[in-house]
Amino acid sequence: MRTDAASRRNHGSGDAAGTSVNESGMIHKTVHVSPAGGAAGDGSAASPFDDIAKAAAACPGSTILVHGGVYGRIALGPEASGGADSPTVIRAAEGERVLIRPDGGTGIRILNAHHLILEGFEVEGGTHGIRYESTREAGNTPLGGVAIRNCTVHGIRGVHGICVYARNDRAPVTDLTVEGCRVYDCECGSSESLVLNGNIEGFRIVSNVIFGNNNIGIDMIGFEGTAKHPGSVRGRNPYEADFVRRGVCRNNVVWGISTEGNMAYVSDGHFDPCADGIYVDGGQDIEIAENFVFCCDIGIEVATEHSPDDNPLFRVSGIRVHDNVIAGCRGFAGLCFGGYARHLGYTEGCEFDHNTLVDNDTQIAVQRSRDNRIHRNLILGGESGVVFNESCRPEDLVNRIDANAAAGIRDRESWRAEYGPLSPDRATLADGFRTLAPDVGSRWIPAPEWTELCREQMKRESVKEQL
């Protein structure tokens, strides 16, 4: 097998620049792909490949430089994998627009690959933009080192913008990165704009911009059966690996996420406003920090949609939500945690601190949960401060809420003295989105261009409501 692989890796060297052999034994070089290339191309600048997947399979561990133009669907398999010291890098050429138009289906699909970086692509249309998937065929070895960077996905009509489905219950996807991507104008149905689902251990979702989609912005999911053990695996909890865990969701901007107009969420002739900007749905041990979420149905939510009556693992823990700014979320709440019905799984052992919540109708919604800490948050405006789900038993709503600060809440009865001081004038606590209260509110401030856009969007929403 090594001899055959080496033969394939030597193919197409031509006059490619920068050829070297790394510790993995792979030959690293720069390989060119262009719509103007031919089937007989050798991957050199003078004679490029015409097929991205062909280039990646022929030269794993190399840099695949993709030149501008329009391409069809791309399918990358395990043969495109690089090594730990030499990942396969598939990158749009500097200053050139590489557009993937799938004409239905998935724009870019990656299956059971590892140590692969996808960078600088634009996907327009189709049912999925970029999809990375692991399956049991990958065996018992974790798949690590996959990164999706600086890609743009828009015009999806069907399911996901960017999705990672780790279906292999035998071994996790590890060291996963989604960074610097833009996902917008997507009709997701009952799915999500950017989602991680299944057996994923160790990830980064950082510096992405997600906007104008009709369902959840960023979702980290567990317990849907994506990586459930098959019936042949006995004596173990079938869901023990079926959840996203140990990751970071940081420095993302998410706005304009709403189910308004989404026919998957029609109830009694009305659209149910339930799309989160950022959602942990069954994920565990995740840090959510320094994100700006505005004008969504729900800002940030931490919960599970499954019942512990069905499996004791169906609960959420180890989530820390801190130093985020959440504004103008008027569908349901700015910050929400806990199972939305009395039988659904607990959110427990989580911490929500140093967030700034501005003019969300309900600032904090508490649902089935216990032993969480909600402190050092700054609450500005809004109809209600803290609202409890009345369908839940009182003993399922026991959390510690203290040391916060609030101003301008219209329903003053929704704010108890033990939550923290309530001021009549918000100008004493904040200058715009910047906190003036010592050790309360987000210590991180969004960039001025984003705060200005937020103000404009909130004004538009206010005018729309008046009409």
Residue locations for each model-derived region?
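Right-handed parallel beta-helix/beta-solenoid
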Residues: 12-14, 18-54, 68-70, 94-96, ...
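Acidic, glycine- and Ser/Thr-rich low-complexity intrinsically disordered tracts
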Residues: 18-23, 39-40, 46, 62, ...
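Extracellular beta-strand solenoids
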Residues: 33, 66, 76, 92, ...
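Right-handed parallel beta-helix/beta-spiral solenoid domain characteristic of secreted/periplasmic
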Residues: 35-37, 46-48, 65-68, 73, ...
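Short, T/G/N/S-enriched strand-turn elements that build extracellular solenoid repeat scaffolds
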Residues: 53-58, 72-82, 367-368
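Right-handed parallel beta-helix
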Residues: 67, 87, 93-97, 114-125, ...
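Structural detector of coil-to-beta-strand junctions
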Residues: 73, 106-107, 115, 129-131, ...
